[in-house]
Amino acid sequence: MINLKIDPEFQKQIPPLTDDEYKQLEENILKEGKLLSPLIVWNSTLVDGHNRYAILQQHPEIYFSTTPLHFENREETIAWICRNQLGRRNLSPEQKRYLLGKQYEAEKKVAKIFRFRT
């Protein structure tokens, strides 16, 4: 099994699943015998798929793949995580506001970094 790094700040951007949602996800993965969607990584650090990866730790026989994405920096990665999470249907209004705020902060930092480079 590939050992991926878990970044607490990245993981914090991902709203937790309810117990029922987590159990359903685990059942689906076990039924398929593999992950249907690859885990998203940046420099060997998990960006998307934290819940699936946690399930894989309990079931190392399950096949999975990873898709590496390129980001210039942590802020760009956080902005991507927030945009991706905002596409989820089960977010509460509070979770949406939090993610929008974090996305805005991260994109503002990215813009500042690129402005200083030019």
Where are these regions (language model features)?
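N-terminal BTB/POZ boundary and linker segment
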Residues: 34-38
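Amphipathic, charge-rich alpha-helical segments that serve as recognition/docking helices
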Residues: 10-22, 26, 31-32, 52-118
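Short, conserved phosphate/pyrophosphate- and ester-handling motifs at nucleotide-, phospho-/glycolipid
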Residues: 49
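Short active-site oxyanion
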Residues: 41-45
